[in-house]
């Protein structure tokens, strides 16, 4: 199919999508389809480039370098100095991600808000019916009884569907856009922060109970998981990042299937990187052994910022690693042995991200001009009447089309 389409001049992902419908539903096959398309183009002797879109004759890595070295703080400045045209729905979110990775400014401030995709624009994951999910951060999967009660009370008050996520936290579904600030105000008052479930950023640090409770535990995996999550929360990257910390080799936190995995040993911590448990599972690889906590944090700082600096748009660490020239040995040299002399620079860049962290939802609900954008209609305060729920297994779910028709009659 791709050969026929390329023969018929389909030389961009948008054209291939229109021709074959590849990537037109969930988008999961887009990276593979892009790879096939470029391989076929190269086989036919056609010019192949890694430009992000028609507005920037640069790869993501080159754009990151231009932003970082040039001290560029806005999309308009980036476009004026290094691009052309007005931008599009590919380069705008990409630029927003790079700007956030470099400078970590509030994503909904005026010059950045218009660049965000629909999830980042409303600081929530939009669902199939137009409602949003709410995911408060629970570092290391740890939550107090009072915290659980507060989440339950908020869910009950606003009639939300509750489910435990794979990342060991509570997901609340069914919030209308105008309810989001009210819900988050109550969660923040109860001590919660944004879980960044909507962002291409650090998601969760999964952990077992470790040596604190488990008779097999070798070290305090929960304590380390909480420390890691609080250090890297808010970091924007080319794609989402997941961690796991296990207190012994029984590996209950599945750290070897995560972007960053840490396993306790009797001499310290083993660090694994570039694992993935998604559509194409990949076993994480051991990059360093028996590390002290300080050395572990140093290597994770370097690894994450090197990934942020060099990966392609929407590329997970596993795919990035597969495409990295020199493979694991090269990655070890750069991160562990500091072969490029970038260590101190990468660590300083990460420290800036850590030092400038803010809970995006706390800033949003306390900034009137940001808060007022959370409504269904620009010229009305009325809620969206097309968001309809029905009861199932004691909770709400989105109404199907025939059920919605009956409810709206």
Predicted regions: what is each one?
Residues 1-6:
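Short, small-residue-biased leader/transition segments that mark boundaries at the very start
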Residues 247, 251, 256-318, 330:
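Mobile "lid/hinge" segments at catalytic clefts and subdomain interfaces of large enzymes
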């Amino acid at each position: 199919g791709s050969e026929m389409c390329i023969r018929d001049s389909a030389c961009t992902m948008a054209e291939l999508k229109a021709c074959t419908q590849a990537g037109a539903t969930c988008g999961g096959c887009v990276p593979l389809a892009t790879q096939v398309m470029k391989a076929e183009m190269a086989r036919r002797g056609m010019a192949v480039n890694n430009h992000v879109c028609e507005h920037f004759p640069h790869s993501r890595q080159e754009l990151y370098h231009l932003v970082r070295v040039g001290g560029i703080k806005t999309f308009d400045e980036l476009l004026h100095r290094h691009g052309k045209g007005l931008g599009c729905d590919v380069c705008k979110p990409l630029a927003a991600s790079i700007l956030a990775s470099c400078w970590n400014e509030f994503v909904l401030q005026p010059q950045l808000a218009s660049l965000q995709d629909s999830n980042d624009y409303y600081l929530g994951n939009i669902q199939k019916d137009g409602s949003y999910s709410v995911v408060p951060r629970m570092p290391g999967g740890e939550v107090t009884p009072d915290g659980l009660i507060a989440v339950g009370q908020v869910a009950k008050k606003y009639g939300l569907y509750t489910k435990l996520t794979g990342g060991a936290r509570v997901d609340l579904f069914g919030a209308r856009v105008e309810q989001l600030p009210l819900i988050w105000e109550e969660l923040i008052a109860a001590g919660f922060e944004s879980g960044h479930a909507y962002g291409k950023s650090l998601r969760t640090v999964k952990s077992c109970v470790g040596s604190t409770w488990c008779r097999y535990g070798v070290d305090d995996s929960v304590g380390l998981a909480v420390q890691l999550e609080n250090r890297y929360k808010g970091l924007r990257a080319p794609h989402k990042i997941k961690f796991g910390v296990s207190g012994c080799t029984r590996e209950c936190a599945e750290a070897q299937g995560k972007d960053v995995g840490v396993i306790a040993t009797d001499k310290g911590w083993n660090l694994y990187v570039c694992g993935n448990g998604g559509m194409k599972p990949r076993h994480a690889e051991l990059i360093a052994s028996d590390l002290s906590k300080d050395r572990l944090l140093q290597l994770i700082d370097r690894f994450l910022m090197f990934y942020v600096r060099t990966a392609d748009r929407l590329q997970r660490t596993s795919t990035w690693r597969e495409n990295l020239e020199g493979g694991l040995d090269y990655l070890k040299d750069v991160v562990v042995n500091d072969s490029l002399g970038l260590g101190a620079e990468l660590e300083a860049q990460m420290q800036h991200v850590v030092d400038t962290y803010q809970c995006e939802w706390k800033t949003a609900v306390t900034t009137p001009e940001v808060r007022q954008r959370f409504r269904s209609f620009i010229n009305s305060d009325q809620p969206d009447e097309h968001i309809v729920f029905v009861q199932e297994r004691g909770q709400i779910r989105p109404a199907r089309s025939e059920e919605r028709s009956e409810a709206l009659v």
